[in-house]
């Protein structure tokens, strides 16, 4: 519960789907609403019983405690999905089944929310807000190009014959950069798979909200945001206002149990360390792990590598088990690797305090899976990226970073399609850390860092969008109070 007087200020309700990559940006949005708008916020999260890292993130996020967090028990969906169902399908079905519990929980609140905000996988709960007569919004913690593709998919579905990945030409989106076949999001890889029909539905449901919040900022993608608002382009598809209110990212608090990593970084020269992490759910094959180990060693650069057990399945195999697994990884590296890199690199099992590492001046480049949270953490820290997309919309993110923004380098071929060899890994690292090209990339990412800070500061674009939303919610709340609407 927020304030003692239940009618003293507006309340906003947020709904987060499972997974740290979804929970973290929702937590940050909640904190932004509290600190900028001075509202009370309740976050409903669908927890994951298998994620050991989740409690650590929650403890860190709520210091100091700004939002009320209520966990909804995840429903048992085992009888509703195929055992081999994709992560996307599991999330869509799980969030569909959570609707009765979410509706009951919101109805049981002692206050009437001024607005309900759901994340990308929670769009079916927009109907709950509609039934309760509450303003409804979607929060997409990704970039504008991804939103453009998502809401345009129902039209592409009619225009494109056969599989998207077999098209010879890039798919055109009005007013936006075309999407090449190798860039499409995972649900578009197979139109016969359930995750495609779920994604198709998403494209229809997003424009039914009263507005779309995005964890990015206007100056990062001005052309795409222009297209989303112009009725000659995507405005006729989006239909509702789009509010870029980012870049919202975690702030570095107490480092917890991994302070020795920061102690080690303190001893390294400025911008000398390669940080390697594939996000909260990304995994590599054993063959790729070995090649990456050799590439790091051959580059002759200092590094921190967050390692998970290799997988023989998809690259998102650790999505529901973030932070879990065995700590002993020695059997997965080249013989003698851990001995040879003792004075040069650190291998960290499972999880690391990423926001602390990214904020450290010794870090010179981030070898990343290009999940949007990690992208924002890198840009806002002024750190260049080696783009290594694995799943979801990460291929689109990698293209945006390398070809549009010029703040990253990437392998010639997709890591999800074939193993990236040690020689290419070595070259990519040295391009950033040693070659003149790295200085130019570092300059551009620092300019974006400044741009993001400007957007968030008073008078900036993201500040103004968030303030406008707050004013809208407060006006609605005051109207409800004056009408003494019952709850």
From Swiss-Prot:
In the presence of other necessary color factors, this glycosylation reaction allows the accumulation of anthocyanin pigments. Belongs to the UDP-glycosyltransferase family. Pathway: Pigment biosynthesis; anthocyanin biosynthesis. It comes from Manihot esculenta. This is Anthocyanidin 3-O-glucosyltransferase 5. Faintly expressed in cotyledons. The active site is at residues 22, 119. GO terms for molecular function: anthocyanidin 3-O-glucosyltransferase activity. UDP-alpha-D-glucose binds at residues 354, 369, 372-374, 377, 393-394. It catalyses: an anthocyanidin + UDP-alpha-D-glucose + H(+) = an anthocyanidin 3-O-beta-D-glucoside + UDP. Its EC number is 2.4.1.115. InterPro entries: UDP_glucos_trans, UDP_glycos_trans_CS. PANTHER family: GLYCOSYLTRANSFERASE-RELATED, UDP-GLYCOSYLTRANSFERASE 72E1. Gene3D superfamilies: Glycogen Phosphorylase B. The lineage of its organism: Eukaryota, Viridiplantae, Streptophyta, Embryophyta, Tracheophyta. One of its GO terms (biological process) is anthocyanin-containing compound biosynthetic process. An anthocyanidin binds at residues 22, 392. Keywords: Glycosyltransferase, Transferase.
């Amino acid at each position: 519960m927020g304030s003692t007087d239940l009618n003293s200020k507006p309340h906003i309700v947020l709904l987060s789907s499972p997974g740290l990559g979804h929970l973290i940006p929702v937590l940050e949005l909640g904190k932004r609403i509290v600190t900028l708008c001075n509202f009370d916020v309740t976050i409903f999260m669908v927890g994951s019983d298998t994620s050991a890292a989740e409690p650590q993130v929650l403890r860190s996020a709520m210091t100091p405690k700004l939002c009320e967090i209520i966990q909804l028990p995840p429903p048992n969906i085992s009888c509703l999905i195929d055992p081999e169902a994709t992560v996307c399908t599991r999330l869509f079905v799980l969030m569909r089944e959570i609707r009765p519990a979410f509706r009951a929980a919101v109805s049981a609140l002692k206050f009437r929310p001024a607005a309900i905000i759901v994340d990308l996988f929670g769009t079916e709960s927009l109907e709950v807000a509609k039934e309760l007569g509450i303003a409804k919004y979607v929060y997409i913690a990704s970039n504008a190009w991804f939103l453009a593709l998502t809401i345009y998919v129902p039209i592409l579905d009619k225009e494109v014959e056969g599989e998207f990945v077999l098209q010879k030409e890039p798919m055109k989106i009005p007013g936006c950069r075309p999407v090449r076949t190798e860039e499409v999001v995972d649900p578009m890889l197979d139109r016969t798979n359930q995750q495609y029909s779920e994604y198709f539905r998403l494209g229809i449901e997003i424009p039914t909200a009263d507005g779309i919040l995005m964890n990015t900022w206007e100056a990062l993608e001005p052309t795409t945001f222009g297209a989303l608002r112009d009725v000659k382009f995507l405005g006729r598809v989006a239909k509702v206002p789009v509010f870029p209110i980012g870049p919202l990212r975690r702030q570095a608090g107490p480092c917890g149990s991994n302070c020795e990593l920061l102690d080690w970084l303190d001893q390294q020269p400025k911008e000398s360390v390669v940080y390697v992490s594939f996000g909260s759910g990304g995994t590599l094959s054993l063959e790729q792990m070995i090649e990456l180990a050799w590439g790091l060693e051959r580059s002759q650069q200092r590094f921190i590598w967050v390692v998970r057990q290799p997988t023989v399945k998809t690259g998102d195999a650790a999505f529901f088990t973030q932070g879990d697994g065995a700590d002993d990884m020695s059997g997965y590296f080249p013989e003698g690797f851990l001995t040879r890199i003792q004075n040069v690199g650190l291998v960290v099992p499972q999880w690391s305090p990423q926001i602390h590492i990214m904020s450290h001046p010794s870090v010179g480049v981030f070898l990343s899976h290009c999940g949007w949270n990690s992208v924002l953490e890198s840009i806002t820290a002024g750190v260049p990226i080696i783009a290594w997309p694995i799943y979801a919309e990460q291929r689109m993110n990698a293209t945006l970073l390398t070809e549009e923004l010029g703040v990253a380098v990437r392998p010639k071929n997709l890591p999800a399609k074939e193993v990236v060899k040690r020689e290419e890994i070595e070259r990519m690292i040295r391009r950033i850390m040693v070659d003149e090209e790295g200085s130019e990339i570092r300059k551009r990412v620092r300019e974006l860092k400044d741009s993001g800070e400007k957007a968030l500061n008073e008078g900036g674009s993201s500040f103004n969008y968030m303030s406008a939303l707050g004013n809208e919610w407060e006006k609605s709340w005051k109207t409800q109070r004056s009408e003494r609407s019952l709850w």
